[in-house]
Amino acid sequence: MYKRQLTDSVETFQEAAQAERDAMMKMLLENGWISKDAAEDVEGHVQEIVEAMHAIMLTSPSLLLQVALVDAVGEKRSQNQPGTSTEYPNWRIPLADADGRVVHTDEVFKSPRVLSMTAVMRGENTRKHV
């Protein structure tokens, strides 16, 4: 695994980040956590991939598992970027779904995407593609 340094170039950082994503996708595909279609069309299968990454946690011996709210609703923007108190509107971005529609607190647990992720974390929806 590549250890990032603050002095690394942007290109080096981007290459390392892409290598990490590629390794994750390869592992998910080779172990049957995602379909071949998902591996070939990541943008069209984001929910399947995110749910698979969470389903893997169920195979660990960990007694405590969690899902970030942004992952559950499909938010694409970062809610917080540490070290950017003036450059980025940390914690002021309204929570939105994968389509950019604002998700209000009373809607969260009615969201089909959240309900699907909840089923994954309960072990009810951990489909493997083998």
Describe the residue ranges of each PLM region.
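Catalytic cores of glycan-processing enzymes that make or break glycosidic bonds
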Residues: 3-130
